[in-house]
Amino acid sequence: MNWSFYTLILGFCIDLLLGDPHGFPHPVVLIGKLIDALGRLFRALLPKTKSGEIAAGALLWVFTAAVSTAIPALLLIFAQKISVWLRLALESIMCWQILATKSLRDESMKVYAALQTGSLSDAQRAVSMIVGRDTERLDEKGVARAAVETVAENTSDGVIAPLLFLAIGGAPLGFFYKAVNTMDSMLGYTEPPYKNIGLVPAKMDDFFNFLPARLSAFFLLAAGFFLRLDVKNGWRIFRRDRYKHASPNSAQTESVCAGLLGLRLAGDAWYHGVLHKKEFIGDAVREIEYADIPHTCRLMELAAILALIVCCAVKACFIF
């Protein structure tokens, strides 16, 4: 029996209910430690040259992806030998830990709550937990914009893309995706010391997110339709601005959200003390408001539910 059909649904529901409880062990933390250890190892073994660092990044990517896929696969095989119900429970827990729907909402709503109280420093601190830019330079609108942007972008990376990988290959493929995404998050920067070692992880992340990012954009458009937002403008901005980002994937969902909400997102941002020039995404039909954070969360959640329905419908065609 194809248990991944049921574990996908169970894992999704558990994620909506529990999110990431504080203090609960998370496999992504272990993946991060593996990346850090392998990075130090391969950098020590290979020449301190551009080609040596690129090779270190390539080896790191292969080993991390392989280990992150093999361990959950072996655990599920052993669980199956003991009991199919143990396999069902274990894979459901794995699926839950791969998805990030509730945690993305919870963390972004902390930013919203801080803005509502009028504490800019608290809002900057809260948004620094979910974005990579230098948040101490942001004013209230900049903080709100950063929160909206990260929810929009992570609708693909944190929710729909892992959901698609889970639907195709169960928890092992889901963890493969999380490893790919985590390597890019930790190493995929254009500044030293990550520029060379992060090249392969960044390119592989672009490759594996190419289709999920575009599918996520369409799920967001569908969610916008059900929420009675400006889908026509969402489609227009998507077609116009979806490549206005250094990554070929990041602006796919961001452009849809900008169009649906009538906002202008992106623009110049500081990272690690360096100003990065970026194009704007969307048109400033209106000024951004604090309430746009929960609005974007609702878009993300409905898009995730629609993606789950489609994934389950497709899987059902092959199972039943």
Explain the meaning of each model-derived region.
Residues 1-176, 180, 188-320:
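Hydrophobic alpha-helical transmembrane segments
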Residues 185:
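Glycine-rich phosphate/dinucleotide-binding loop and adjoining beta-alpha-beta core of small-molecule
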